[in-house]
């Protein structure tokens, strides 16, 4: 079974593309969602986070105090890197366990916004970048997440690799720019990945 990473900047349409692959019977591991889940549910990871960031990192009911943790790491690269060093190995283990449950599939997808930035793409067989220009991604994100400000979205974009960097690193590109059929692109790529 091949392990294929799928990434793209915020608002590029990664989840939409993954849904098309799922219609073809290809399972998708949503790494960003699982990272959040693990931070609230994995006892070992919770203990590490509480040790490094204080007991305030969790509410009394055991749920992650996202706003506290966000304030702790926002603007502090050292703390953010520490959090990533705690979370990413847990996600990698979770992904590998998930893969064993899907060993009968020709390939699986690992959807992650920071696939290249974290280096996790190096453990995969190939990568797909979902591409859309920055203006379109900004528009989509503001429509999808009305609580976000334009400044907030642009700040997230600045922390992600540029379109050019992602394109250079990716093995395959799917253009989700409203000028080409994503279904046709996914179908063609699916055929290649089955070989």
Where are each of the predicted segments found?
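Short gly/ser/thr-rich secondary-structure transition/capping motifs
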Residues: 89-93, 108-113, 154-159
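ATP-dependent NMP and nucleoside kinases share a basic, alpha-helical "lid"
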Residues: 94-101, 107-142
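Small-molecule kinase domains that catalyze NTP-dependent phosphoryl transfer to phosphate-bearing small molecules
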Residues: 122-123, 134, 144-192
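ATP-dependent small-molecule kinase phosphotransfer cores
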Residues: 33-106
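A general structural signal for well-ordered alpha-helical segments in protein cores
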Residues: 3, 18, 46, 66-67, ...
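Walker A (P-loop) phosphate-binding motif
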Residues: 1-33
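Residue-level signal for inorganic ion chemistry
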Residues: 13, 32, 83, 109, ...
